[in-house]
Structure formats: structure tokens, C-alpha cells
């Protein structure tokens, strides 16, 4: 049985079959979620203390740490990072191909 290898697009969500816009939206949300989780871990915060810092409930922190990406908007994640004292900035680049 031959194994087929496909070159990645650089976006795991695109590779999984999501459209370009949806894949990019998911990529941004996942990166923001990862950064929030790293911040909580680096500061050694429990879910309850993290919730107080970020202005959300403990179950929301549980959703965050469990990767429930569908439960968070980019706006919400940016607000949470802001409450933790993190300034979010984006670098925008042009895609190589536009369909």
C-alpha cells in the first residue's frame, strides 16, 4: 500500500478542507487561544484565578484550555488578552495566489 504525501498549505484548517476564509479565521482564533493558554500556564494561574484575570467564568477557561474553538470569537479572545495586559497586533501579507 503506497502512502500519499501532500504538501501543506501552511494552514492546517485549509489542509483539512475548510475554505480559504474559514481556514484563516480558524487559524487566527487558534493562535489567540494558544497564546492565552500559554499566558495562564506561564503565570501559574488556576482556572478560577485565570477567569478572574480575564473577566470570564471558570467554565470559559475550561473551554479555552480544552480547545473549544467554536465557542470563541476573535473579538472575545482579543478582549481577554487585553484584560491580561497583552497588546495584540497583526501582520498582514498578501497571499501568493488569489482564486
Positions of PLM-derived features:
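Short, amphipathic alpha-helical "recognition" segments used to contact nucleic acids or chromatin
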Residues: 29-45
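Short alpha-helical DNA-recognition segment
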Residues: 44-62
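DNA major-groove recognition helix of helix-turn-helix/homeodomain DNA-binding modules
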Residues: 74-91
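N-terminal flexible/basic segments that precede or flank functional cores
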Residues: 1-34, 99
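Amphipathic alpha-helical interface surfaces
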Residues: 28, 32, 57-60, 73-77
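DNA major-groove recognition helix of helix-turn-helix
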Residues: 65
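Short, charged recognition helix plus adjacent turn
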Residues: 89-99
Amino acid at each position: 500500500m503506497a502512502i500519499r504525501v501532500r504538501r501543506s498549505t501552511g494552514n492546517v484548517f485549509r489542509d483539512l478542507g475548510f475554505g480559504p476564509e474559514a481556514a484563516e479565521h480558524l487559524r487566527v482564533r487558534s493562535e489567540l487561544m494558544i497564546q492565552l493558554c500559554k499566558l495562564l500556564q506561564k503565570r501559574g494561574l488556576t482556572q478560577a484565578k485565570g477567569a478572574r484575570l480575564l473577566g470570564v467564568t471558570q467554565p470559559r477557561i475550561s473551554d479555552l484550555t480544552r480547545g473549544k474553538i467554536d465557542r470563541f470569537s476573535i473579538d472575545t479572545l482579543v478582549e481577554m488578552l487585553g484584560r491580561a495586559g497583552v497588546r495584540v497586533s497583526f501582520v498582514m501579507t498578501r497571499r501568493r495566489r488569489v482564486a
